[in-house]
Amino acid sequence: MAGRQSHKKIDVRNDTSTRYKGKLYGIFVNYMGEKYAQQLVENMYSNYNDVFVEIYNKMHNALRPTLVKLAGAGATFPLWQLVNEAIYAVYLTHKETASFLVTKYVARGVPAMTVKTLLAEVGNQLKELVPAVAEQIGSVTLDHTNVVSTVDNIVTSMPALPNSYAGVLMKTKVPTVTPHYAGTGTFSSMESAYKALEDIERGL
């Protein structure tokens, strides 16, 4: 058929990385030219791979039997939401405490025991994959009895990390400084920042 280019199908590899990079490249090549678009797309794909393929896919595959056991195959949707929220918002960015997550999902009709069991499972699996989480949880094996107190302690002692932290944590142990944007050279020291502000005020 005209316009379908069906004869070309054999030339194009149809795996995820090719499709993903191809779509992104098509978008960015118009903005920044071939060389930079190529670099950007490679970079984006490697981030996608590190986070989603290496972390989320592995977690989902490991937890699937547990979810089906807890909810039956047809009712796993809210539990998948719980798993993803636990990975990102609780363990990686410390935006939510474990007790908050329990309250939230109990209100949505998930039994507290199920929520705690899953939270503990997520923590135990993440420990194997993400060095920083292993470092935070330590040698404790999480279960439904200790997960809330242990995780609440971790979250409240280092609360509300910036979203970019999730990517940092995926690959390294806990950095010594919280990776908020450090500022430009002149503004990263408090003295020069205040001095600059005073100069501005004088000029007003």
Curated annotation (Swiss-Prot):
User: What UniProt keywords are attached to this protein's entry?
Assistant: DNA-binding, Virion
Q: Which GO terms describe its cellular component?
A: helical viral capsid
Q: Localized where?
A: Virion
**Keyword Transit peptide on entry:** no
**GO molecular function: any one?**
DNA binding
Record text on subunit structure and interactions: Heterodimer composed of major capsid protein 1 and major capsid protein 2.
Report the domain remarks: The N-terminus projects into a DNA groove.
Q: What does this protein do?
A: Self-assembles to form a helical, filamentous nucleocapsid mesuring 1980 nm in length and 24 nm in width. Together with capsid protein 2, wraps arounds the DNA and maintains it in an A-form. Capsid proteins probably maintain the DNA in A-form by non-specific desolvation and specific coordination of the DNA phosphate groups by positively charged residues. This certainly protects the viral DNA under conditions such as the extreme desiccation of its host.
Q: What is this protein called?
A: Major capsid protein 1
